[in-house]
């Protein structure tokens, strides 16, 4: 779909899969840039696009989630972050504290290990890295703008309760 002269394209492109991978990477990035109004992925056949999506999901799952191969290592990368959350929550709950909120901003690659460590939803389940796409896709589980909220409050008895929301879902 990208070339009008198929023979010339085959002559210029020595490694077809590498080329498709490069077009996929650029096309994926363009989807995040609305002002470009550019959809490069429409030029890739679905048969070539689908394996790209599978491989990307598998790799990201293996590197950042609770995969059978690397989950313990990935989850440990969130130890300090969780400890920081809990210490700030403890400080906010102390008598006389005026702290109402702590906001943190990060990236999906920081959120995924934290959710695995805490045992939250799909990110707590262990799959093998290869084939993880059969169970979940990155864009479904950790879409752009993903968020995690821990809301601490006291009930009428004075007990501390925590409401946790992942992408606005309890």
Give a label for each model feature:
Residues 1-102, 106-170:
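Signature for phosphate-centric chemistry
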């Amino acid at each position: 779909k990208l070339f009008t002269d198929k023979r010339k394209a085959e002559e210029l492109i020595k490694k077809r899969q590498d080329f498709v991978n490069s077009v996929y990477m650029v096309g994926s990035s363009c989807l995040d840039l609305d002002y470009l109004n550019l959809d490069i992925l429409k030029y890739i056949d679905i048969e070539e696009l689908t394996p790209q999506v599978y491989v990307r999901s598998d790799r990201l799952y293996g590197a950042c989630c609770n995969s059978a191969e690397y989950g313990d290592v990935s989850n440990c990368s969130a130890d300090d972050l969780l400890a920081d959350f809990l210490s700030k929550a403890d400080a906010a709950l102390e008598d006389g504290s005026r702290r109402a909120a702590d906001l943190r901003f990060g990236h999906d690659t920081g959120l995924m290990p934290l959710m695995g460590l805490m045992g939250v939803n799909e990110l707590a389940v262990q799959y093998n890295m290869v084939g993880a796409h059969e169970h979940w896709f990155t864009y479904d589980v950790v879409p752009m703008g993903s968020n995690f909220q821990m809301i601490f409050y006291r009930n009428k008895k004075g007990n501390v309760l925590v409401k946790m929301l992942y992408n606005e879902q309890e």
